[in-house]
Amino acid sequence: MDPSSIDLGSIPGGSEQQQHEDGAAAAAGSPKEVFRSQQSLGLITQRFMSLRQRNEVLNLNEVAKELNISKRRVYDVINVLEGLGYVEKVEKNNIRWIGDNNNSEEQNALEARVEMLRQQEKLLELMIRDAQAIIELHFEDPIERPYNYVSKEDIRKTAEPNTKSIIVKSELDTSSSFEIQVTDPSTSGSHDMIVRNKNGVKSHALLFTNDPPEYGDEEDEDDVKKLSSQKRFETSEALRVTLAEMLTDPTTISSSPKHIKLEEPEEIDTEDLETFVLPPSTSASQSNAPYLPETPGRGLFFSPFKSLIDPCILPSFSDDLTSGYINITTPSRATGAGAGASGQEDEEPVSVMDFFSD
């Protein structure tokens, strides 16, 4: 058939004029187009969901009347919702909502768990900040600085046996970042490791095996451990009287002097007395608790926390050791009415032991 012989006007909607008229009618919002848009499945579902908020059990006949749609379209919506697990049929022409309640309970449980995890995260962040502050204070304390090191034995305890460790040491008080490069062993037949300091700070590297040291017997091992402990802390026997014992029995100091052993301390420059403060665990408000120095032979230590107590507050035992109280005095100042009358101040001590003498 010749295409030119086809009459386009005989085809419904085939002519350009007819198509233009249909488009104009649709644009003007003809009743036919409005009715078809109202019968769309998406719009019916939205209207159907608004009815569901009024009553959990719905009658399909009442729904069809209220929405002014055919019952067939209502069943189309119900079949979709039933397939998704939101509704179930309880009686003839009656449905009940089931999906929303289950999802609500599950959602509430998930939200509660998220809130709990959020609180735990905040707690961990606080703990991390506290730990970082403690570490910073630890490195600032000049008494603790000599002990800021890691021994080979500490590394061997955490490393796998029969392996090797590379220790990189930088200069003190430097923040360095390192990069490690490992070459391809296919060319050289071995792994070549290059450790480079990105900041250009001078560093030293040490390679040692993680094999545990061999001892002849258990006694030798115990002797080595004792010797290592003495060498690390470089202290003799410390004070053995604990705070708990003193609180329960205030006469511990006088009745059990064998527990206390004080060695003659080093002489302290009197100009540095203003920089000595009480240990962090002891404050002027806690002066009623018995005080014993934890640092062997010293009892007082240089600390960056000078601003906590001003002027210099030094503890000294009272004459009555059984009372369990501490006198907080400033040795560099005159004490008592007799000193004021004589116009002379007490001589500054040359040893910390002078503060603990009766």
Curated annotation (Swiss-Prot):
Residues 1-31, 331-358 are annotated as: Disordered. Residues 36-99 bind DNA. Disulfide bonds: none annotated. One of its GO terms (biological process) is regulation of DNA-templated transcription. GO terms for cellular component: Rb-E2F complex; RNA polymerase II transcription regulator complex. Keywords: DNA-binding, Nucleus, Transcription, Transcription regulation. GO terms for molecular function: DNA-binding transcription factor activity, RNA polymerase II-specific; RNA polymerase II cis-regulatory region sequence-specific DNA binding. InterPro entries: E2F, E2F-DP_heterodim, E2F_WHTH_DNA-bd_dom, WH-like_DNA-bd_sf, WH_DNA-bd_sf. It comes from the Eukaryota. Disruption phenotype: Reduced level of constitutive germ cell apoptosis on a ced-6 mutant background, in hermaphrodites. Blocks DNA damage-induced germ cell apoptosis, but does not affect associated cell-cycle arrest. It is found in: Nucleus. The keyword Lipoprotein does not apply. PANTHER family: TRANSCRIPTION FACTOR E2F, TRANSCRIPTION FACTOR EFL-2. Transcription activator. May activate expression of the pro-apoptotic genes ced-4 and ced-3. Required for constitutive, and for DNA damage-induced, programmed cell death of germ cells. Belongs to the E2F/DP family. This is Transcription factor efl-2. It comes from Caenorhabditis elegans.
